[in-house]
């Protein structure tokens, strides 16, 4: 029997298991269901027994997302598995057709291949033994609204668990930051090329405010929404930028121009994010 040792704490109570885990639940120890707390992500083998039930929870301010670990068609599990939107077995079943379909990103109509709960709890009932072996991935995710008001668009543009909302109402950098906070999000802090490309491929040819600023100390750039210094992290300044002109203390981004230091009071679109 193979044991997976990464960051999992396993306790057995009667015939059920209670597991806090970030990766793989070992097949031989799972008994037939139990309680599972998802700290980040977990992959479980579908049991070979019938009527096994996992009660799954995560942090109260997050939700859960279920997908197949191999990326296969999620609908193939329905013959063997029912995922309930809550711990009660009478809670509604989660189906692809009753999910929010965003206008952009991985959860837009036609490509959605995972299901999301509406709270931090779910019950997974393996009602029949599967005819083939497959693994179910369960991740902790943030809630992602359809939009954050008029002239806005939201979606899971980077991965299954985070959320980005573009607002096309022009505001100052400080006002865009306040708008994001009012919607339980933060103004964009770009941590990688992958993240920046996702933003620009989703909303091209648009200038966006970020939370980057050197307003506290000239030349010391900080992602205000996270408190993390820009350097030595990822940066993508445009030609001759930052040019350190007086009053240009906030980072404005564009898909073809790169990053610019710009006057924080200028009215620009913005991107909010939640992770």
Regions found by a protein language model. Give the residues of each.
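Well-ordered beta-strand positions enriched in small/hydrophobic/aromatic, beta-favoring residues
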Residues: 81, 163-165, 210, 250-251
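Domain-level representation of secreted and single-pass membrane ectodomains enriched
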Residues: 3-8, 12-150, 178-183, 201, ...
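Extracellular disulfide-stabilized recognition modules
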Residues: 143-185, 223
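Carbohydrate-recognition loop of C-type lectin domains
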Residues: 245, 250-271
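Surface-exposed ligand-recognition segments of extracellular binding domains, strongest
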Residues: 208-247
């Amino acid at each position: 029997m193979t044991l997976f040792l990464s960051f999992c704490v396993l306790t057995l109570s009667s015939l059920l298991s209670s597991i806090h885990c970030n990766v793989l639940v070992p097949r031989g120890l799972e008994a037939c269901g139990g309680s599972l707390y998802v700290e980040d992500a977990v992959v479980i083998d579908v049991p070979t027994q019938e009527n096994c039930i996992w009660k799954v929870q995560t942090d109260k301010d997050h939700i859960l997302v279920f997908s197949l670990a191999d990326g296969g068609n999620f609908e193939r599990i329905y013959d063997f598995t029912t995922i309930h939107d809550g711990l009660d077995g009478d809670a509604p079943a989660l189906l692809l057709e009753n999910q929010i379909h965003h206008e952009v990103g991985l959860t837009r109509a036609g490509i959605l291949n995972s299901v999301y709960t509406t709270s931090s709890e779910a019950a997974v009932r393996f009602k029949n033994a599967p005819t083939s072996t497959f693994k179910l991935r369960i991740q902790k995710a943030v809630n992602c609204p359809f939009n954050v008001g008029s002239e806005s668009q939201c979606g899971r543009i980077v991965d299954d668990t985070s959320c980005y909302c573009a607002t096309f109402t022009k505001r100052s950098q400080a006002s865009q930051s306040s708008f994001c906070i009012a919607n339980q999000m933060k103004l964009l802090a770009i941590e990688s090329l992958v993240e920046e490309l996702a933003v620009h491929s989703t909303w091209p040819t648009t200038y966006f405010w970020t939370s980057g600023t050197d307003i506290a100390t000239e030349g010391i750039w900080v992602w205000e929404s996270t408190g993390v210094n820009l350097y030595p992290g990822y940066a993508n300044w445009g030609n001759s930028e930052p040019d350190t002109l007086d009053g240009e203390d906030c980072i404005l981004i564009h898909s073809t121009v790169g990053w610019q230091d710009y006057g924080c009071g200028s009215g620009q679109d913005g991107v909010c994010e939640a992770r």
